């Protein structure tokens, strides 16, 4: 992790069906580094896993008394959410990173639509609080599979009143129709976090909007079909090493295989920890960290998911 801060679990409570909210305080009682809305922390669990969670209470403070995160139960979890839901107790000692923000709100956006799906409400709730504090004209659409799964519902109602619009899939015959609801653009920007189908629908519905007016955070990076993955040569320039990255492995896997210890956290292309400088090669970007402009520059990549489209990739490592 980029930093190592000792924390203690001060409180655990349910904020929706299968969603637990955690309050984390510095183990020594010190203030924690502050963050702006949209920021996340890396949370290191005793089972050896490191997971990223959005800060629900980050609104731009210089320091924070505590970090608040929410964790949804995931039956397909690789061990993070299951461990938290089944084993985490008040008083548990953990370690976290300093906050990072790859989903920051632009100050020039004064009319904002916030769109949350499921556990994606966590950064969106922080943004709603920040908008209220800064006098931004904000509207929030929150959706979930069923009403009991809408997290922070009472807090959002108190904060937004009639500017909060709720959608339960089981009561309304399926997911929200974004194409219909976004037919008229009344906002400077949309900020969205939720499951891939919702964000894919948002992308299609706003394809004609101005660049930079739709910003989203995904739960995991894109997956390249196995039929499109080809082996390629990897050169680590400063280390003086080269190897072949097989079709079934990532650049990060190959680096570790040849003995290079490179920082990583999510291994899903969403946290930005494993960003590496590119000297040569056609990068196939599969992350959700870099902007379209940064991707076009071909100067850096997330080695946990992105690959090389040509025969040779040279990294400044």
From Swiss-Prot:
Write down the required cofactor(s).
Answer: FMN
Pfam families membership: Fer2, NAD_binding_1
Coiled-coil ranges per UniProt? none
Q: What InterPro entries would the database entry show? A: 2Fe-2S_ferredoxin-like_sf, 2Fe-2S_ferredoxin-type, 2Fe2S_fd_BS, Beta-grasp_dom_sf, FAD-bd_FR_type, FNR_nucleotide-bd, MRET, OxRdtase_FAD/NAD-bd
Q: Where is the FAD-binding FR-type domain?
A: 4-106
Asked if Transcription regulation is a keyword of the record, the answer is no
Instruction: Cite the binding residues for NAD(+).
Output: 110-220
Q: List the keywords (alphabetical).
A: 2Fe-2S, Aromatic hydrocarbons catabolism, Electron transport, Flavoprotein, FMN, Iron, Iron-sulfur, Metal-binding, Monooxygenase, NAD, Oxidoreductase, Plasmid, Transport
Which amino acids does the record list as binding [2Fe-2S] cluster? 266, 271, 274
Q: Which domain of life is it from?
A: Bacteria
Ranges for domain 2Fe-2S ferredoxin-type come to 232-317
- What is the role of the protein in this entry? Involved in the toluene-4-sulfonate degradation pathway.
Protein's recorded name: Putative toluene-4-sulfonate monooxygenase system reductase subunit TsaB2
Organism of origin: Comamonas testosteroni
Q: Which gene encodes it?
A: tsaB2
